[in-house]
């Protein structure tokens, strides 16, 4: 397991084959993907806070190789406001894509230059650093679009580049229409939360996500190339056993591939 600059050097030195995506897990819902010559950080959670069960594997100032930073929604373990100024400085050419609904507040809070922050909303598709990125609304308990603007505060992203298609749901529950939206893509790699939700967490302000069964019942019928469960390891009281997901997938959708990732350990997926 590599950390810090050693991890950055490994990412820089890794060369994906044609039609291949390389990926690294940083814990929680944070992933790094590399496709061809593009390095994308999704929800990098790098602030070292006391409540974390897993310490950050990279310091914000070590993140020197980003082309794109994707933030799915404005919670601290997804859009890590304290870390963003250092990330922006360390990767001076990186672009930051986030929900349009939170763009103004995030810019004001982080000081990241407005010309580097790209607002997204379902069903927009934008080309960022030559990478095609589509926004898909996520229901973090609720869809909750702004009644005036129609902007969704929580998004997932479909990333298309180099013949590979990757979906990161962000924090999301199943809602009517989600599967239909995703059917338009042949997704090679998907990252889904499995920590679920309940009354106790909701009443204490911890809004939830798919259960492991719901994540399976999204991934299975859509036949994702490889589905990675996540968002189950970082905070006490908001956890799940990832083997529950992989076992359920194996029983119910035996032809679908899943994997429990290891921290900062590269894995690869080929386009189908």
PLM features: residue spans?
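Cap/insert and terminal regions of metallo-dependent hydrolase folds
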Residues: 95-97, 101-104, 173-265
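Pre-active-site segment of Zn-dependent metallo-hydrolases
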Residues: 9-13, 32-74, 78-89, 143-144, ...
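Divalent metal-coordination and catalytic microenvironments
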Residues: 33, 43, 73, 80, ...
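Metallo-beta-lactamase
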Residues: 2-18, 98-164, 248-271
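Active-site metal-binding loops of divalent metal-dependent hydrolases
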Residues: 44-46, 73-74, 138-140, 170-172, ...
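Structural motif
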Residues: 38-40, 67-68, 95, 131, ...
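Metal-dependent catalytic neighborhoods of phosphoester/phosphodiester hydrolases
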Residues: 80-90, 105-109, 237-247
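Active-site-proximal beta-strand elements of phosphoester/diester hydrolases
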Residues: 22-25, 39-43, 132-138, 165-171, ...
